[in-house]
Design a protein with these regions (language model features):
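Basic side chains
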Residues: 2-3, 404
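Mature extracellular/passenger domains of Gram-negative fimbrial/pilin and adhesin proteins
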Residues: 20-426
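N-terminal hydrophobic targeting signals that begin at the initiator methionine
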Residues: 1-2, 23
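N-terminal signal peptide c-region/cleavage motif recognized by signal peptidases
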Residues: 14-18
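Sec-dependent N-terminal signal peptides
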Residues: 4-13
């Protein structure tokens, strides 16, 4: 009798727990090894004196996907299959490479972590959740996937994009990490060359029924339990094409002043449809070391100036089919072009130099190469007012033009678009 009663009780206890199927790896591939993952596409990093690059200056930034990667070039390759009923049990788990002192161990402030390059720190952000990467393994729901019948297929492209922003710092943290793996610390202060410390900057790993990630919520300093399963997806400045570093501590330019808000006069829908446009001035004042004129250009070792749209605005022009193969665009649109009814549709902003040369807006998909950059002192006029004997002030004038977008229907509303002015040592 007791045995019968115990059996019945156990049956109902077991029935009280939900039954989840086990997710399956479909086409396993390990792109979690050190140089097997995705590149950040930051290109060449140019360091200048703190006078021209104060701590916090953006050196490079991009948005990338965990696939394509060195070991997995196909973003449509199915990596996992799960039951549709388990859709609320699927997660992305992510962290910096916390056991490496140049891969994500040392937070230099505001979520920027020391890298192998001296006086640089990197911030990674999980774009869909807006959460910055930290040493603590965070998990967020994975909500993008392909549904096939009663199954969910998870591909490389289904994981969130990740933004990478590298800034200038005024110090280094060369304290040892939990591991070294050949990189005892950041490179020497005067280092130039390739990012030859073969350590990623971060990882993402899938979590679902039967695919546990014990390190979730733990510190990646010494918790990386799932790494040996081959499920980690790595990415870093060390991954081909690797980042490189140049330095020039004697010359440089900085933005001293600029037109923060470019205000256009009103224009009717009919006028825009008839090909008319309105213009407004954009002025930038630059403070440059003497004889910087000789370094103004877009080739290696030269100083360039560029305009990068907000990531939201860049995504919008992509969706409108107005970017080139390298991600550049001749148009800047409102940051929330599609989501705010009060914003005008079918219109965008173009820039040109004072001599009439068209200016492209930079890409977010890659910071490599010189496409979209202009010589820093192109068409610049020397002006008085410098407070430093070894500096000169220059003024650059641009014309911003509000015009109809090709192939689009114009609707009434406001235009609220954002772009950043960047100076780069190529």
């Amino acid at each position: 009798m007791k045995r019968y009663l115990a059996a019945i009780i156990l049956f109902f206890l077991a029935a009280g727990f939900p039954a989840f199927a086990t997710c399956t790896r479909i086409k396993p591939v390990d792109h979690g090894c050190d140089a097997c993952g995705a590149p950040l596409n930051l290109g060449n990093i140019g360091l200048m004196n703190l006078r021209y690059q104060p701590a916090g200056t953006v050196l490079a930034r991009s948005v990338f996907q965990v696939v394509p990667a060195v070991k997995n070039a196909d973003p449509d390759r199915v990596l996992y299959e799960c039951d549709l009923a388990d859709k609320d049990q699927l997660f992305e788990v992510f962290a910096t490479n916390g056991d490496s002192n140049v891969g994500g161990a040392w937070d230099m402030g505001n979520g920027y972590f020391q890298t192998y390059f001296p006086y640089t720190a990197l911030k990674l952000v999980h774009v869909r959740s807006g959460k910055p990467f930290t040493r603590i393994w965070q998990k967020v729901p994975l909500t993008q996937y392909e549904i096939k019948g009663n199954k969910i297929e998870i591909r490389g492209r289904d994981f969130s994009p990740i933004s990478a922003e590298l800034i200038r710092t005024d110090k280094n943290n060369r304290s040892p990490g939990y591991n070294t793996f050949g990189c005892s610390s950041a490179a020497a202060d005067n280092y130039t060359g390739a990012y030859n410390c073969n350590q990623p900057n971060g990882y993402v790993v899938f979590m679902g029924p039967g695919m546990n990630v014990p390190e979730a919520g733990q510190d990646s300093w010494n918790h990386y339990d799932t790494w040996g399963t081959g499920r980690y997806m790595a990415f870093g400045m060390n991954t081909a094409p690797v980042a490189t570093l140049t330095q020039n501590m004697t010359q440089g330019c900085r933005v001293e002043n600029y037109t923060a808000n470019v205000i256009f006069p009103g224009i009717s829908i009919n006028a825009l449809n008839e090909g008319h446009a309105v213009t407004a001035p954009l002025t930038i004042t630059l403070a440059c070391a003497s004889e910087t004129e000789n370094l103004s250009g877009i080739n290696s070792g030269q100083l360039s100036l560029g305009f990068q749209p907000s990531y939201a605005a860049w995504l919008q022009v992509q969706q409108l089919g107005l970017t080139s193969g390298d991600g550049l665009s001749r148009y800047l649109v409102s940051d929330h072009y599609d989501s705010q009814p009060s914003l005008a549709k079918g219109v965008g902003i173009q820039l040109q130099t004072s001599s009439g040369q068209p200016v492209s807006f930079l890409s977010w998909s890659s910071f490599s190469g010189n496409a979209g950059w202009r010589p820093v002192l192109e068409d610049a006029q020397a002006i008085s007012g410098s407070q430093q004997s070894d500096e000169k002030l220059y003024q650059r004038r641009f014309s911003a033009r509000l015009t109809k977008l090709p192939g689009q229907t114009v609707t009434a509303g406001q235009v609220d678009a954002t772009a950043s002015i960047l100076i780069r040592l190529q």
